[in-house]
């Protein structure tokens, strides 16, 4: 049967169908009824009796030998056609005549071939579904089993997907009818008939089979009794089927994170001596790790050697070992084996290497790897995983790729955890496209389980690129295509992307949609934390306090991130650093939650904005006293504080230089207590720029080279130097020593890097974090263009940056304008920028200065009111322009325009030029012409020729139409 049959059937109606000419009018009239109410018994009896008395069109395959003429005669007069059969079954089902649906189906859907009674080949999916549902509704279980058996026998080889769809439809209807135990029993029985077994351990491979059953397991209004189902199946269908179904249950329960039920199913298998397969062992180890029963992981793993065929199992074993032992004790245990004359096995190496990899002991891991190779051992999964993890932990991402290739070299299958590490490597490289390639590879390998953790990592990566569209698409792909249950992990990741993309309201909408359906085990606190972060971004203190109250009243277990949000709320919205410090004091003494660098970082950032250098230094002392590892941002703030303090006290900055060198050296050799041994470039980039300005460019270059030597191998220098923070520092260095040719080359690379990022396949939305990437840097570019006599290139560059949405600070605008006014070729472009933007901010600032001065002047009338001034007092930020002409720039461009106009000898030409400027740049020219331009030759004549214009302009101080000039 062609799959197009159901589609045709869905679209047919009474009028479009081809009815036999012999169908009586009273039957046709009945069939035109479109209602769903039950038929009266007489009408139903007449209708069914009529069709039961007729035959059906013979199948060609039967080979009845009828002539074409005879067949046509039957069709037109006495035989029931396929269309009539389909319409009749649908009609009777709609009118709830289930008994007669069965009667008609048994007569017209079946045919006899030889001694066998088989379903017809043209039986369609909707017909069969209504037939089966009618049997179910009338509780005819034996007939239902027989009908399913007939369908499997007839269509399994040609229409397996349709058969599975029918079984799942009946299963879902049984669930709706609260026949849960019977539904599960039948589903297992029928799936065994279809597949020859009932053991399914990969959702994506068996999505069609498992989709409805998984939906049943997830329903909040259903409480399945899995052990009861297993007992019934074992009793009636035998232990082999019960064991297979238990394996399926165990896999699905861990897939949807119902670990308590998964443990109960595992215990059932063990208590009833059912066979333990590889999937069972993997699932129970995963369950024990999630339930933090680490002491059971090792004993369970070693108890079932015949089931150790999945690399993921060793991941859970390694995690458990690392949680239960400190690495010093493991090292001693490992070394003791040599002492008693027993050489460590490859398993010993794997466990010890992984434990040391977790704490970033790369040298120890490499030494052990070299040692086992010298002993002629072949690396195992655990050994290779440990090597990969150790290099990831220290930020050696380039080495991660080469170590990942070792899995292929030694013919070892990477596990889910291996791919997770590689996704984290791409996250460290900020390479979303590379991460997508990993996901594509995973989706093509049915042996690898794709988890929520994989998607959460990918979604989180969208924070850096602020690509909320891709993040949302990933979330939908996870929940809809892979049918992975979302928890706080993926929801909070998506919320974070919305927040970083400046869409906090969408993050809040996500919180309101999902928070009600999550439990604390599902990471509910993570979702609350992101909601608080979103409200902080909206500066809504009341909503933040509401969420804090909800968390407290519901006694939700909090985490480190919660306290981070509380500190951020106090510092950002309440401007209460004292209370924030008291929370840090509480965390230092907390028995469960550990204080970390991110808690201190928030307060340090606030102190940095205020210029409170001593506060930053005192906070760092507190961290040192309590052995809290610093991160790169903490080191950045402390270095900046020390440097700024030295400059304020007119001291030399040698102390800062020495401090930077010490920090780099100690971080590189592992003696500095930091969260990450490879320091972020910003730690030395800011001091480097400061040294360029206040000490020696040569010293800054030495610092830069030393940083590369300590933290990057020679072949990694190029990739490190391509980072924006490093390129910015080098650009500042080159500008300070006026190496303009090199500056021009590097700036072109800087622009190319931005364009490459914008042209990546994953760059479907603009990255708002790149908008300010030219702030503080653009004035140097202007200086380079002036020095190389290329200022005529500035308008095109300026236009390009503005069109792409880059934000340039006020210093950049002023430096650009001043440069443009100095060159006759670009003066008009500079005037346009001033007229469109900067002059308005300048006038607003000076207007308020004048109003403030007048309001403070005692000689003025005391009852004089200034409404604009009062408005500014109420909303000061609203009347503070972000872009404006600085006074020195204003004076400079006025002089430059004087010089330009003074160079025009012809009075008529001068007059036309002024008129043209008034027409095109009216706001700027209004300010310019408020004072007589005495430095311009022939200006007195201009004043005399346009006396009324200047008189009105200087009196009204408002823009006048050019026609009045």
Curated annotation (Swiss-Prot):
Signal peptide: none annotated. One of its GO terms (cellular component) is mitochondrial inner membrane. It is a single-pass membrane protein. It is found in: Mitochondrion inner membrane. GO terms for molecular function: mRNA binding; translation activator activity; tRNA binding. It comes from the Eukaryota. The keyword Glycosyltransferase does not apply. GO terms for biological process: mitochondrial cytochrome c oxidase assembly; mitochondrial translational initiation; mitochondrion organization; positive regulation of mitochondrial translational initiation; RNA processing; tRNA 3'-end processing. Keywords: Membrane, Mitochondrion, Mitochondrion inner membrane, Repeat, Transit peptide, Translation regulation, Transmembrane, Transmembrane helix. PROSITE patterns: PPR (PS51375). Its main location: mitochondrion. PPR repeats lie at residues 310-344, 345-379, 380-414, 415-450, 451-486, 487-523, 524-558, 559-595, 596-630, 680-714, 723-763, 774-808, 809-844. The chain crosses the membrane at residues 237-256. The keyword Transmembrane applies. Present with 1160 molecules/cell in log phase SD medium. Required for initiation of translation of the COX1 coding region. Also involved in the stability of the intron containing transcript of COX1. This is Mitochondrial COX1 translation regulator PET309. It comes from Saccharomyces cerevisiae (strain ATCC 204508 / S288c). The lineage of its organism: Eukaryota, Fungi, Dikarya, Ascomycota, Saccharomycotina.
